[in-house]
Amino acid sequence: MASIQIRKYKDEDAETVKEIFTLGMSEHVPSSFMHLLKQPPTQMVLMCTFCALLTSSKSFLLPVLAVTLVLAAARQLVVYMFNKYIDTSLKKDLDNITGTYLEQKDSCFWVAEYDGRVVGTVACLPNENAPACLELKRASVCRSHRRMGIAKALCRTVADFTRDRGYAAVILYTSTVQTDAQKLYEHMGYEKIREFLIPEFIGKLMNFTLIEYRLDLQRDTQNN
């Protein structure tokens, strides 16, 4: 049976890493769209649009078409938000992983290999707002290789790296729609610290919430 190997990133991994990141982020579009539909303002717009057109046109078809168009526009808004984030990330740290993570102090980027194929990624670097912590970033595993313990192995790699360098904790940020990630982090001992809206206009419009988690390494060591 093939084994999982966690190793440091190499330049030849670049395209695979970008693909894993892009596909992983794109998976959250459907759940984010459903999150948007559950928001009271969205439901009010849909209801008012339907009722207003039904009353004014005396036709059932027109309001149905109008609501369909509003839903399509809402989904495109979600797609735009994720595509913008993906594009920004690919142009920033993921465009120069070696320079961003491997050549900087207390930073690193790892990939997970399964049967010689890169199927997962994770990284960490110092957090600007929490000097005593390293921040876990870019955690992603191919859909075809989930439920195999790869994500846990990647998270443990970051925790060990952080502990070895004398930092007190690992922090990370995930979104309210990433329920599987939340379950994983909480299972591994991370505690939810706070929730906050994405500061951009679209994030506020969608009521898209980010969650900050923290793993206290001293307590984690005692529990183990």
PLM feature spans:
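Hydrophobic adenine-recognition pocket in adenosine-nucleotide-binding enzymes
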Residues: Y9, A139-S144, T174
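Conserved GNAT acetyl-CoA-binding A-motif
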Residues: L134, C155, T162-T174
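Conserved acetyl-CoA pyrophosphate-binding loop and the N-cap/start of the following alpha-helix
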Residues: S144-H145, G149-T157
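C-terminal "cap" of GNAT-fold acetyltransferases
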Residues: I171, S175-N224
